[in-house]
């Protein structure tokens, strides 16, 4: 379950609070991703997607939810593929009798995943698998660590994604995604790139206008 949550949050740019419930005695159906909100789309040897209906977004409560699609990753990334991991998780939970109206991440005892339980599980896994650095590594992890991953990776690889595309992928209403960039220089590079693209587009538009007026 923990791996499924991590991969879903990473590739789907989810906030942890969007995939968990505040507490066992505070489950609001209208704010929770349920089993029925998740679909696996497509057939084998065709384009396949993991589709998640997010009923309520923290930063866009005025919207009536949001549809998030994550493609099945290529074979060389299968261990990091949320589609494959979710497929196995749903098969296991459906066999165990999970209701379509249960919170998506519910264990076999019927308890839904909370932020506290998730944090404790990740902390234990890191300490167990990386005893030498696990303690220090866990200190740097935050609830938004998965959500910030895509902007950070784009920065590290110097892969400058169009601002509007990046904001759309992460469902950011503002330029808040810039806060997730891990280095000041990287943030400046991203801003400069966006500004240069704007200038370039304006310049191209002016050139087209000039050509039009010369022809007329």
Predicted regions and their residues:
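C-terminal secondary-structure termini that scaffold catalytic or DNA-interacting sites
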Residues: 189, 193-216
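Short, basic (Lys/Arg/His-rich) helix/loop patches that form interaction surfaces
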Residues: 92-96, 119-163, 168
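The alpha-helix within a helix-turn-helix
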Residues: 9, 20, 167
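Conserved tyrosine-mediated DNA breakage-rejoining catalytic core shared by Y-recombinases
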Residues: 21-83, 88-91
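Basic, Lys/Arg- and aromatic-enriched nucleic-acid-binding interface segment
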Residues: 1-17, 79-80
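Catalytic-site neighborhood detector that most strongly recognizes the C-terminal catalytic loop/helix
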Residues: 168-196
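Conserved, ordered domain cores of eukaryotic regulatory proteins
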Residues: 70-119
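Acidic, Ser/Thr-rich intrinsically disordered and amphipathic helical segments
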Residues: 18, 81-88, 117-124, 150, ...
């Amino acid at each position: 379950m923990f791996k499924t949550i991590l991969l879903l949050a990473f590739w789907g740019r989810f906030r942890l609070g969007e995939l968990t419930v505040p507490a066992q005695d505070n489950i609001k159906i209208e704010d929770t991703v349920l089993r029925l909100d998740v679909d696996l789309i497509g057939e084998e040897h065709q384009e396949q997607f993991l589709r998640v209906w997010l009923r309520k977004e923290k930063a866009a409560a005025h919207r009536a939810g949001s549809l998030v699609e994550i493609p099945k990753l290529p074979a060389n990334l299968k261990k990091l593929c949320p589609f494959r991991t979710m497929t196995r998780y749903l098969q296991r939970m459906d066999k165990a009798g999970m209701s379509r109206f249960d919170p998506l991440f519910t264990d076999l005892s019927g308890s839904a995943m909370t932020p506290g339980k998730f944090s404790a599980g990740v902390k234990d896994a890191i300490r167990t698998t990386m005893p030498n650095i696990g303690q220090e590594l866990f200190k740097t992890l935050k609830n938004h660590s998965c959500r910030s991953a895509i902007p950070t990776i784009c920065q590290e690889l110097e892969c400058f994604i169009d601002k509007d595309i990046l904001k759309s992928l992460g469902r950011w209403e503002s330029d808040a995604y810039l806060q997730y960039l891990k280095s000041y220089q990287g943030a400046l590079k991203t801003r400069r790139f966006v500004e240069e693209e704007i200038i370039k587009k304006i310049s191209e538009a002016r050139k087209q206008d000039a050509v039009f007026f010369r022809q007329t």
